[in-house]
Amino acid sequence: KYVQLGRPLRFYGGTASATEVGCNLRCKFCFSDKPVWKPKSTGRFYTPQQVFDGLSQSAQKHGYKLISASASEGTLGRQHLFELLDLVENSEYVYILETNGITLGADPEFAQALAKYKRLHVRVSIKGTSEDEYHELTGAMPSSYRLPFLGLGHLIDVGVSCNACVMVSFSN
């Protein structure tokens, strides 16, 4: 489910991005608003082909080689993601998968399934520097703090291009 397809972003030197709906965290600092907090009444469903076409049109218009979906959690609709990545694999683009890493950390097979995609880069967002800070920032169970780290390990183990993005709080 998406709010819009193909908006230009300045990140990574220019990216065409679709605005996703739905997340498994409720971060205090989240800018997404309705896509996260009101997913039932926000956006509409698109096929992977429609999403790819929207991203491709925006990327061509702005001269971008990178495409992504952001503003929510991109790993929740796994089959949709795989079908979208199949389309990207046969294109000139690189897909940036932005994720909080929870699903990847919980399921090593997910990372293995992503390993076949060579036009994929995964950006795992690490939220906080401790279990307590993570819980305070995301509302998630402190014990799930380890999952993004496990997800990064799973990705590295199977050779998926990836990096960590660390969000820290200076509130203490």
Language model features with spans:
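N-terminal [4Fe-4S]-dependent radical SAM core
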Residues: K1-T19, K28, S32-K38
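Generic hydrophobic, aliphatic-rich segments that mediate packing or membrane embedding
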Residues: G14, T19, C23-R26, T47, ...
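Pocket-edge positions in alpha/beta enzyme catalytic cores
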Residues: T15, K40-G43, A140
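Conserved AdoMet/S-adenosylmethionine-binding subsite of the radical SAM
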Residues: S56-L66, A71-N172
